[in-house]
Amino acid sequence: MSAGEIDRLIGLLARLPGLGPRSARRAALHLLKRRESLMDPLMEALGAVAASVRLCPVCGTLDTRAPCSICADPRRDGTLICVVRDVADLWALERGGVFSGRYHVLGGLLSAIDGVGPEDLGLDRLAARVAEGPVVEVILALPATVEGQTTAHVIADLIEPKGITVSGLAQGVPVGGELDYLDDGTLTAALRARRPV
C-alpha cells in the first residue's frame, strides 16, 4: 500500500461523523495493524451492506428487505405512524422498545437556507399512506429546532384536514434532570407543556 492509498483511507475515514483527521489517522493505523482480525472482516461487511441494504419503499428506513421488517411485521400497529427526521432517530426509538406502530422517515427537515422543500422530504408519500388508512394518529418525533418545528407545522397542516390526530413528543425536563443544569429553551418548553399531577 503506497502512502497515497493510506492518505486516501485516512481522508475517507475523516469524512465519517465524529472523526477528524487525527482520529482518522489513528483508526487507519489500527485497521492496518489488525488487517486479518479487523480490516478484512470490515471490508466484507461494508461490501455486504452496500450490496444488500436499500431504502424501504414504504417508510424510508434502511433494511435488506422491501418492505422493511418493521413495515412487514403484522404485530406492528398500523393505525400509528411516527414521523422521524432520519434513520438514526428511528433506531433510537426502536432501542427504547416503547413504540409499536410504524414509521415514516423524512430523510431531513425543511430548510429554506439549504433549499430543502416539502417535495424533497417525500411528504406526498406520507399523505398517501395516511389517505390509504387505517391511520388514526401521526406522531411527529422531530427535533425541537426551528427546522424541526417548521417541518412539524407543515406536516400537521397536511394531515389534520384528513381528520387524523397529529401529536408531537413531549418536551421539557428529562427524567433525573436538575433545573439548574437545563437551558432556557428546555425550561420554557417544560413550563408550557406542564400537566396536572
From Swiss-Prot:
Domain Toprim: 79-174
PROSITE patterns registered for this protein in UniProt: RECR, TOPRIM
Pfam families reported for this sequence: RecR_C, RecR_HhH, RecR_ZnF, Toprim_4
Zinc finger (C4-type): 56-71
Molecular functions (GO terms): DNA binding; zinc ion binding
Keywords: DNA damage, DNA recombination, DNA repair, Metal-binding, Zinc, Zinc-finger
Domain of life: Bacteria
UniProt GO BP: DNA recombination; DNA repair
Matching CDD domains: TOPRIM_recR (cd01025)
Signal peptide: none
Gene3D superfamilies per record: 3.40.1360.10, 6.10.250.240, RecR Domain 1 (1.10.8.420)
NCBIfam families in alphabetical order: recR (TIGR00615)
Protein purpose: May play a role in DNA repair. It seems to be involved in an RecBC-independent recombinational process of DNA repair. It may act with RecF and RecO.
Protein family: Belongs to the RecR family.
Protein name: Recombination protein RecR
Species the sequence originates in: Rhodospirillum rubrum (strain ATCC 11170 / ATH 1.1.1 / DSM 467 / LMG 4362 / NCIMB 8255 / S1)
Gene name in the database record: recR
